[in-house]
Amino acid sequence: VERRRIKREDILSAVLDLLCSSVGSLTNPTNIANSLNSKQKLKGEGAVANNTVKQYIDNLTDAYLFSECRRYDVRGKGYFDYPNKYYCEDIGLRNARIGFRQQEMTHIMENIIYNELVIRDCMVDVGVVYSSEKDDNGKPKQVAREIDFIANDGEKKLYIQSAFALPDEEKAVQENKPFSLTGDYFPKIIVRHDITKRWYNESGVLNIGIVDFLLDDSII
């Protein structure tokens, strides 16, 4: 706080809590600022500016409390400015900060996978792909779909979906569909909590349990 000359420690604390509560969710400074101003009824000179929130987020990432994961257009080959995702460097600290509430296992598992990829020296992005579909009126539209992680290590690239469970065919199709839209043949993996033995589906996508994934360094 002293080193960065933080003037509003209350806002820094609120930003910290919001990031802890939204790991794995798309986040941008504008939405956070609007949320804080609305909840705390801040107006005029007392209102929180977007740039202030951005600065505080940067400070938290510089302190290695959070890591920013940017969104990447897989086929357009470019990064989006916002929104991005933020993951806790230490899940234990995150849980302690929010009093061990909000134990959404889907987001926690996603955070653990992200941290593991970083530990394995991968550069990690969130993948964005597009599919051509029709709206309710039968008119064509572009739909953005997300791949949880693109892990890059030199010339190696790996697409990864984090899925706590795939209880039915509909959910399985939902998780697999973005893989078919990448336009390339790099390996694709779904890391799951509900299986123990690894197997490949008909599209060549590896389904692997979270424990198996964390213990096998050869995957990446």
Regions found by a protein language model. Give the residues of each.
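A cross-kingdom feature that marks ATP-driven nucleic-acid transaction machinery
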Residues: 52-220
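Conserved helicase/translocase motor-coupling segment
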Residues: 1-62, 68
